Amino acid sequence: MTAIAPVITIDGPSGAGKGTLCKAMAEALQWHLLDSGAIYRVLALAALHHHVDVASEDALVPLASHLDVRFVSTNGNLEVILEGEDVSGEIRTQEVANAASQVAAFPRVREALLRRQRAFRELPGLIADGRDMGTVVFPDAPVKIFLDASSEERAHRRMLQLQEKGFSVNFERLLAEIKERDDRDRNRAVAPLVPAADALVLDSTTLSIEQVIEKALQYARQKLALA
């Protein structure tokens, strides 16, 4: 009998710290890593590259079905490869982020990308970073964590990230964009952003990243009975 690889799902809104947590957990456990948000960003970027309308579900489905994407972990960094090109930086722009949120709202697009995401499930295990990993993609995952933080704290973190990269940022505009995106993600008809019924809800608003990692790893090891 073939062993089924265990999955730890980390869901939550943008800016809660999922990416940092997932990389740390994957490194600590030596597991594979899936950044599902990157897949939607890659599809959005591919649509922009190929001049496909991100508001057209019919146009996006064939692109999603044949999306050439893979993840390569190098020295603790996750490289996102689209059609043989490293697009790790390009998919993190605000334009692509906004387009990705639109793309993710289409049922047939999500279905086309579902199989691709599930194919990342391999031994010894998978850390799955996203918004509906525990509710839709891996509903049988033995460990589910929903990482949250206040919209103000997430806007503050995003502002610091952008400022470190040399961008001039308006906090109020950034906060408004995050709230608008939250509202869209939480209230969409397909796979809304909600914690799975059996997920641990972890609020990172007042926690350091080290505290978040410690709590998440402790919970996962208890659930999986790992040393």
Curated annotation (Swiss-Prot):
A GO-annotated cellular component: cytosol
Molecular functions (GO terms): (d)CMP kinase activity; ATP binding; CMP kinase activity; dCMP kinase activity; guanosine tetraphosphate binding
Protein name, entry field: Cytidylate kinase
PANTHER family named in the record: CYTIDYLATE KINASE, CYTIDYLATE KINASE/PANTOATE-BETA-ALANINE LIGASE
Gene: cmk
InterPro entries for the chain: Cytidylate_kin (IPR003136), Cytidylate_kinase_dom (IPR011994), P-loop_NTPase (IPR027417)
Organism: Escherichia coli (strain K12)
Top EC class of this enzyme: transferase
Its biological purpose: ATP, dATP, and GTP are equally effective as phosphate donors. CMP and dCMP are the best phosphate acceptors.
CDD domains, alphabetized: CMPK (cd02020)
EC number annotated for this UniProt entry: 2.7.4.25
